[in-house]
Structures are given as C-alpha cells and as structure tokens.
Amino acid sequence: LFNVLSNNYFDFEDGVTALDLFAGTGSISIELVSRGCDKVISVEKDPQHLSFISQVMREVKTDKCFPVRADAFKFIEKCSEQFDFIFDDPPYALKDLQSIPSHIFENGLLKENGLLVLEHGKDQNFEDDPHFIERRIYGSVNFSFFRATVPEAE
C-alpha cells in the first residue's frame, strides 16, 4: 500500500498531515510517522490499543502522532481539522461501513486534492461514489481510493 501511495500520490515528507481512523494497534500510524508525515492523528476506541499506540510513539521518541480515544463516527462529526491523507480500516462487518466516505466528505475532513483510502472486504463496492478513483485488491484485502477533488471529465 505505501509503495502505491508514495509512487502515485504523496511524498510523505512534504508536510503531509494524516488521520488514521479505526487505528487498531497503530501500524498505519507508525508507518506514516516513519515515512515523514508532519502530523498523524490516530483514532481508536479500544483503550488497550490506544495505550499501545502511545507506548510505541514514546519509544520511537516522536511528537508527530496524537492518539485519540474516540468512536470514529463521532470523531468525524466533531473534527474541525482537515487532512492530506485519511486511512480508514473499519471492521469489515461494520454495518455503517458503506457510509464512511460520505461522512468524511460531508464533514470536510480532506484538504483539496486530499486522499482517502478505505480498507474493506470484497463485498463492498464504492465505484458509484462521486469521489471514488480506484480500487486495489491484494488477496482478500480491498482498498478503495477517494479524492476530495475529482477531476472533471473531458
């Protein structure tokens, strides 16, 4: 995933700000920090996972990651910040999974030309979303990519 992002979308060392929703144990957040993101907010509801993320960030001595204990949907609704990159890895069985992209765009969480990557199972299809740009499949893992600004058809 990060090779695709680096080769096609971002130079993470170029002042990129990121949001990691449903951060779990923080592997994506850690990778974002290691690749040079200026700021990463990790949103996770589980206190043990959040504690682990905080511990790892202390061990690597970074001040670039900000773990937040919150429900991802409530965070999306209340967040007033905008990001260059949002990674979202909700539980595949989450009943509201299909609505996540629209919540993110309705609440203006992405900067202009910002990128949302949503990890999901094979049964979800986002190709009709107006912000959808591509889908990548790696075994049983699917990533749908969305842009805050969709290029106009020529």
Give short role names for the model-derived ranges.
Residues 2-154:
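Class I S-adenosyl-L-methionine-dependent methyltransferase catalytic core
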